[in-house]
Design a protein with these regions (language model features):
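Acidic, divalent-metal-binding catalytic cores of TOPRIM
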Residues: 1-186
Length: 186
């Protein structure tokens, strides 16, 4: 999905440079610290949401599955993972929890889900559900805005805010999105 390109490192680099005025050369230490933090939190998020993403991807491979049985929100289900960038992002749900949320969905065997997890893991940023990826980026930007508003800034250097809504994220961040070569030539 197009939203996945907004979670790429290149997009966050551009946001840090433009919106937060953190220069990768003159502010190298801060820039690298913030990028490393972003990558770490994104990896935590990926690991915490991987099982759900794998389960949902497996549903698409069940011939008898009807989309009416599982309707997903644009946001990751809070009952499965209610996370904050300020603290470790860790999954606390199981397949049984997912099945309880979606009782009309077909049962997927654990080994099938594990195979799908391995398949998705080749590039989590591009392979996981784009709506959840952009939600994570949005939450990370809110985290940066909060950091910028404090006197003891750790990941920003000025009182700068990058404001937009989650619903308007694709439009607001379009100038920063990573665009792969094959899409440029399309």
């Amino acid at each position: 999905a197009i939203e996945n390109f907004y979670a790429m490192d290149d997009c966050m680099r551009k946001i840090l440079e433009t919106e937060y005025e953190i220069d990768p050369i003159s502010d190298e230490e801060l820039f690298n610290k913030t990028m490393t933090h972003y990558q770490t939190k994104r990896e935590e998020f990926h690991q915490a949401t991987l099982m759900f993403n794998a389960w949902y991807a497996c549903l698409h491979e069940v011939p008898s599955w009807s989309h009416d049985n599982v309707s997903l929100s644009h946001k990751f289900p809070k009952s499965l993972l209610n996370y904050s960038i300020d603290s470790p992002i860790v999954a606390s749900y199981t397949i049984l929890d997912i099945e309880a949320m979606y009782p009309d969905a077909p049962h997927i065997e654990d080994d099938v889900i594990n195979i799908k997890k391995t398949s998705l893991s080749t590039d989590l940023t591009l392979n996981l559900r784009g709506k959840y990826e952009i939600e994570f980026v949005y939450k990370y930007i809110l985290f940066l805005n909060k950091d910028a508003g404090t006197r003891s800034r750790q990941y920003t250097k000025k009182n700068k805010n990058y404001n937009f809504t989650l619903d308007g994220a694709v439009t607001s961040m379009s100038q920063y999105a990573y665009i792969p070569e094959d899409l440029r030539h399309y």
